Structures are given as structure tokens and as C-alpha cells.
A protein has these predicted regions:
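Active-site-flanking beta-strand signature of metal-NTP-handling nucleotidyl enzymes
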Residues: 3-9, 47
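An amphipathic, aromatic/His-enriched active-site/gating alpha helix that lines ligand/cofactor pockets
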Residues: 25-38, 51-87
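Short, surface-exposed ligand-recognition loops at beta-strand->loop->(often short) alpha-helix junctions
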Residues: 8-21
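A short, structured loop/turn motif at beta-sheet edges
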Residues: 12-13, 56, 98
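Absolute protein N-terminus
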Residues: 1-2, 98
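Short, low-order "capping/linker" segments at domain edges
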Residues: 85-98
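Short, solvent-exposed polar/charged micro-motifs at secondary-structure junctions
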Residues: 46-50, 95-98
Length: 98
């Protein structure tokens, strides 16, 4: 069943273009990935949204995705509230309302 992962970030002032450029160059060749989108959700706030064939593919790709995060970590600002630099969630689609 299709699954999604979403990761929320806040980029340090002056680093937004670096953040976007880094994502253009990142490894996205993950088994089972259908689409990866970057959305701007606010001032210096972004979300990465990935669509996957199933949850197992997300789990398998996590080490490589963490490697991608390591490449941009210094561009990110702490989200506060004990979250750290990212706010990730993932799960299977339970209702498809096309």
C-alpha cells in the first residue's frame, strides 16, 4: 500500500538557496520512491514530501535519507520544543480521497 513521508525543516537565514540547491543534487534513487516534492510552508520553512510504493521502502531508504540530511544539517535551524532540526513523520495511506 502506498505510503508517504514528510519532513519539516526551518532553514537558517540566508541559506534558502543553498538548501534548495543541495536538494537538487541529492541522491533520490531510492527503491520504491514514486515522487519527492519540496514545498515552502512559511518564512524559511520547508517540507519534503515523499510518495512511496509501501512503508517497507521508506524503512529501507532511511539510512540513505539520513545521509542526505547530514549534507544539509549545517543549513538548518532548530525547530524548538525539543524537536531538533527536523520534524519527520511517515505512514501508509489509509484513505485515498482523490
Amino acid at each position: 500500500m502506498t505510503a508517504f513521508n514528510v519532513v519539516r525543516f526551518r532553514v537558517k537565514p540566508g541559506r534558502e538557496q543553498d538548501f534548495l540547491d543541495a536538494h537538487r543534487k541529492m541522491n533520490r534513487d531510492f527503491a520504491g520512491v514514486k515522487a519527492i516534492k519540496v514545498i515552502k510552508s512559511g518564512d524559511r520553512s520547508y517540507c519534503i514530501i515523499g510518495e512511496w510504493s509501501d512503508m517497507a521502502d521508506i524503512v529501507t531508504a532511511r539510512p540513505a535519507m539520513i545521509g542526505n540530511l547530514d549534507a544539509i544539517r549545517e543549513m538548518l535551524e532548530d525547530l524548538g520544543g525539543g524537536l531538533g532540526l527536523t520534524d519527520p513523520v511517515s505512514g501508509p495511506v489509509v484513505l485515498d480521497l482523490k
